[in-house]
């Protein structure tokens, strides 16, 4: 995967009814450490690679390390992140021959689950993609076993392109259907 080198970053914050999507900040470090060390959140992403304490040491003071990562804020607190990046051409799974599609991903703290926050945030990010990179195909990959992620992808309008084995599990690869 590679960052969005063709997009000015950071963008202006995106404000929805309940959320703010913005660049990550120093005050997000604690929430990022919680997100990246939570076994439930990371269950379909290979599991936590570090403890929360280790991550609090490893995450840079300025966690805004690359373009394409939106921190999601709800009621003044970091609750998750959305990543937007170019899908590297080396991957075997693409929707266009030359690859390099825009790929979106999302991770949210369990306190947000079932409240529509992931849907609201991801819709806002998809709107930003459409305004910033009009006409670009948008793709998403999630484990087939990650039923909540798969439901969200379908709810957002992603349709299955194919399934494949990767990272020791069956993966679902989809693209955002044209309206």
Indicate residue ranges for each PLM-predicted region.
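Active-site rim helix/loop that mediates acceptor-substrate recognition in acyltransferases
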Residues: 48-71
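Acyl-donor (CoA/ACP) binding surface of acyl/acetyltransferases
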Residues: 1-44, 69-179
């Amino acid at each position: 995967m590679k960052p969005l080198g063709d997009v000015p970053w950071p963008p202006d914050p995106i404000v929805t009814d309940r959320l703010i999507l913005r660049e990550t900040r120093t005050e997000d470090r604690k929430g990022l450490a919680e997100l990246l060390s939570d076994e439930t959140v990371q269950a379909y992403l290979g599991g936590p690679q570090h403890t929360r304490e280790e991550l609090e040491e490893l995450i840079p003071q300025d966690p805004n390390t690359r373009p394409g990562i939106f921190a999601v804020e709800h009621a003044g607190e970091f609750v998750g992140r959305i990543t937007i990046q170019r899908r590297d051409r080396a991957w075997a799974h693409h929707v266009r021959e030359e690859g390099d599609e825009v790929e979106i991903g999302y991770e949210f703290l369990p306190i947000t689950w079932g409240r529509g926050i992931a849907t609201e945030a991801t819709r806002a990010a998809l709107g930003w993609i459409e305004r910033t990179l009009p006409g670009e195909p948008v793709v998403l990959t999630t484990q087939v076993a990650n039923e909540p992620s798969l439901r969200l992808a379908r709810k957002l309008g992603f349709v299955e392109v194919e399934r494949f084995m990767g990272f020791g599990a069956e993966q679902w690869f989809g693209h955002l259907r044209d309206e």
